[in-house]
Design a protein with these regions (language model features):
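Nucleic-acid enzyme cleavage-core boundary/entry regions
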Residues: 1-138, 151-179
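Short glycine-rich or small-residue beta-strand-to-loop segments that form or flank ligand, phosphate
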Residues: 139-145
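Acidic, divalent-metal-coordinating active-site segment for phosphoryl/phosphodiester hydrolysis
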Residues: 147-149
Length: 179
């Protein structure tokens, strides 16, 4: 929190690093010096959970406040038809997504598993910067596993989009058991 405050007051430059780098640069050394590193608890996962809480639940901050870098930036594309989004659970679908996105000038995102609130924040920020009207209807075409995990990933992505102002969505699942 102190780093965020210093960045916002322009006393320090934005971090421009990954969350994991933030953990290794600031949090882990501090816990180590305090004798508070735990081998029983995944404290990095706790950090991520706490930051997500501060961003999404308590709405105290945004990832861009600190300047975290989006490690999934290369796996998303904003198309001219930005309100049509083809997304997949797996990074391995990135080439397919890119081909379709280029052919039809649509947006695409390969999530790489459970979607990151940070990734969605920056994706929607890119839309805002491009002048995309977030109040219009968005059509989301999902390529996720036809199982509970896939549906959780799909629903989490849609929920994150809604959190960032994209609330008029229609989801079309492209994976069905009869395929």
């Amino acid at each position: 929190w102190q780093l965020r405050e210093r960045i916002l007051k322009k006393e320090k430059p934005p971090l421009r690093e990954l969350l994991r780098t933030f953990w290794y640069m600031y949090i882990k050394p501090t816990l180590s010096r305090a004798g508070a590193l735990s081998s029983d608890t995944d404290q990095y996962a706790q950090l991520i959970s706490n930051i997500v809480f501060m961003v999404k639940d308590a709405e105290l901050m945004e990832y861009k406040d600190i300047g975290f870098r989006d490690d999934n930036q290369a796996n998303r594309r904003l198309g001219g038809n930005a309100n049509i989004i083809l997304f997949s659970e797996k990074l391995g679908h990135q080439d397919f997504l890119s081909d379709i996105a280029n052919k039809y000038n649509i947006s695409s995102v390969a999530l790489g598993g459970q979607p990151s609130v940070l990734n969605v924040e920056y994706f929607v920020d890119t839309m805002r910067a491009a002048g995309v009207n977030l109040k219009r209807s968005f059509y989301l075409f999902s390529i996720v596993d036809y199982d509970t995990s896939g549906w959780i990933i799909r629903d989490a992505f849609v929920d994150d989009l809604r959190f960032y102002g994209i609330s008029h969505t229609q989801v079309i699942d492209l994976i069905h058991p009869d395929m």
